């Protein structure tokens, strides 16, 4: 599945709150599957499904908080440097400024969802 979705439709259809959009009017989604980037945030990129919508749940956010700030910066820089379509953060876990700045730097749309991780995952997969 490869499709282009208007950002506005994506936001409205999934009831997302945009944190950073950049100039993008569309998202190129290559799969209805999602990627939970725990392995990538730990530094493993060998089998990274970068063409999927990326979903940060409580585990990913808490893991990032546990890292030394310099290590966290390096991991975020590496992760966001890949051509990922967008990142959704579940459970209204508003990201810290470091995540927002790196998303801006690499022009990766960043969204917030009030839903728990499983619910937003299911909605994205059928969207």
Segments from the language model and where they lie:
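Feature captures the catalytic cores and cofactor-binding loops of soluble hydro-lyases/lyases
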Residues: 44-55, 59-127
């Amino acid at each position: 599945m490869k499709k282009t979705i208007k950002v506005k439709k994506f936001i409205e259809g999934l009831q997302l709150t945009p944190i950073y959009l950049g100039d993008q009017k569309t998202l190129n989604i290559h799969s209805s599957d999602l990627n939970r980037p725990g392995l990538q945030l730990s530094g493993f990129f060998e089998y990274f499904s970068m063409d999927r919508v990326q979903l940060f749940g409580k585990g990913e956010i808490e893991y990032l908080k546990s890292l030394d700030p310099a290590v966290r910066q390096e991991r975020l820089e590496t992760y966001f440097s890949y051509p990922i379509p967008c990142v959704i953060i579940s459970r209204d876990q508003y990201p810290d400024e470091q995540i927002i700045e790196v998303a801006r730097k690499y022009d990766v749309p960043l969204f917030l969802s009030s839903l728990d991780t499983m619910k937003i995952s299911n909605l994205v997969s059928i969207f």
